[in-house]
Amino acid sequence: MSRVQQYQSGFTVGELDPLLRGRIDLEQYYQSVAVADNVLFEPQGGVSRRPGLKFVFDATADNAANGVVLIPFEFSTTQNLMILGSVFNTANTIRFRFFVNGILQTNINGSGNTYLDRTVGTLYSVSAIDIDKLYYTQNADTIVFTNENFKPFKITRGANNSTWSLTTIDFTSNPDKNAPYTVFTEAVSQPNATLTPSAVSGAITLTASASVFASVGTGQRIQSYTGYGRAKIIAVTSATVVTAITEVPFYSTDAIAANSWDLIQGWEPAWSATRGWPRTCTFHEGRLYFGGSAQLPSTLFGSKVSDYFNFNVAEGLDDDAIFATLATDSVNAITALRSGRDLQIFTTGGEFFIPQSSLDPITPSNIVVKSTTRRGSKYGIRPQGAEGGTLFIQRQGKALREMVFSDTEISYVANNISLLSSHLIVDPQRMALRPATDTTSGDLLLLVNGLDSTGYRAASTGFTGTIAAFMLNKGQQIVAPSSWTTDGDFIDVGVDLDQIYTVVKRTIGGAAKYYVEIFDDDRTTDSAIQYYANPLAPDQAKPSNTTAGGLAHLNGEVVKIIRDDIVDADFTVSGGNATLGGVPSVYAEVGLNYTVTLKTQPFEPRLPSGTVASQKRRILEVTPRLYRSQNITINSRNIPLQTLPISGLGKVPTFTGLKKTQGFLGYTRDAQITISQDQPVFFTVLALDYKVSV
């Protein structure tokens, strides 16, 4: 039998779909792995243990089981927050909490409370709040919220992070200004009375020769069909006199003959308690846009320029409000809006944008909605912008696509960037992007999978409740996905500039708990508390004895203990305490373990004589190139790295370099290498060199 040596120089393709297991003709095959569980691929090509999770807050008492949402809020270049919204009462109340650098803000508005409640009022067409459909957009110190089943509202930050105002955006107190009008059921009559306009255009008075306006409301239209002229009623002075704004100038100020003009009724505010409310929102070029509403799901509403809550279409001047409906040959309910290179409109049936020639602004007179691709996007998952493109989940929830402008096609295209790893996407619920924070990192897209695998392939079994983590670097054409799991289910994820928050559902002491946690590069366990000098809550001060407290959220759970980089014996938390193996010199960490697995593809050396797929193979030697690693196992064998504690330094040194490992036994058809850890400490694999007997 011959010996073959192979070198895998990186892992920049990530975990490959099992359906591609036989595609040894693809170059991506040789830069991929078969399993990538709880690892993070580096844009340079290596792979590391994923960050651990810092425990932040127990949201169970906020009735988080009813639904939660994480909302990033960037007040300035130096002040960023994460807002947690929970459905405190399914009938009418959302509770908001505010976190700065992982610390819960207290005494909100001087109330002594650590939260702010929003009573949404009467729901439009449902009996319970669906927070998955809560959409939001931010401008300066204000964040606007929409949901088709209750009135839009806004939260505005005050003088500090504990001062917030919560206000309803009221379209009913002055509907002529605040809300656009439309006809749901039209009623047209030709009154038996003359009608005399006071002027041909602008704000005018219309006087009838009989009492025809006694039961007419504002917003209704009057149209002459002898000559021309059309006006919108803005005030009813009496049964014979109304004030109106002309939409089409009248021919003259002469009286229009009886039965020669139409009184068009049925006009009403587009949003109301009987018609529902806006679905989605975004700010774009000085306007607030609402995308769709409960009964007008395909209509785009744009505010007056710099008057964000004025949606009065008025005379159609350049700065007036915009009202445009997607008139297409299929149902296109708007699911999301994004302000990018253009105003992008995502719908259930396809993707649209509003082109702007010569960089002109969008106005009522030049607005044109163009169709680009017909993939459709899933409602409730916000598209994310990354390196000039927009990432979105296809309507069926089975593909991650990138909407990007193509100069060759002079339009947008929607490429499937999850094609090589679609098995990692199962019932997606939320999505967030952490942009590259320095020259050594890439964009990290985090996609939270739901709990319903119905309709998904068998290859997707086991990925419910996980996070599909895509490391992206467009310049290097890197899309490297992995799967992140924890002791429980991930529910939501949000990014506060560079901090990644998540909500995790865990079972603690037999009861369901909902914890807010933060991915932390300095931790190697989940739901972890660290002990060190001058801690930030909820971390604790370094103990002077072997008792580590502050662990009530892990009562009854078996935890891992790391003390000055030394892994102590496992311990079952009792009374909120754990016992350390000694007094720490610098720090200690207590948290839940998570398993790391990296498994290579079946060995295929690409010999001139052909494939070796049908032959048995034996791994003879594996030499990983490691970087700052403290523990690693290869095919269940612990590999000694000579990283012994240094007395007095309070840490274990890391190993960097090549580590030759021999003595692997047994022939298999695949000859795969499984890299894992038996201790929760750091490791990074840059490359693999291995010899196989064929």
Question: Can you say where each PLM-predicted feature lies in the sequence?
Answer:
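Autoprocessing Asn-cyclization modules and mimics
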Residues: 106, 114-118, 157, 166-262, ...
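Structural signature of eukaryotic scaffold interfaces centered on beta-propeller domains
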Residues: 64-78, 125-139, 271-285, 329-340, ...
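Beta-sheet repeat architectures centered on beta-propellers
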Residues: 2-104, 332, 404-694
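N-terminal beta-propeller domains
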Residues: 1-112, 154-159, 163-199, 260, ...
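Surface loop/turn motifs at the tips and blade-to-blade linkers of beta-strand repeat domains
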Residues: 61, 271-272, 327-328, 371-375, ...
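Catalytic or ion-translocation cores adjacent to nucleophile or general acid/base/metal-coordination motifs
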Residues: 360-397
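Short beta-strand elements that form the blades of beta-propeller/WD-repeat-like
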Residues: 80-86, 141-146, 288-291, 335-347, ...
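Residue-level signature of beta-propeller blades and closely related beta-rich strand-turn architectures
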Residues: 149, 294, 349, 357, ...
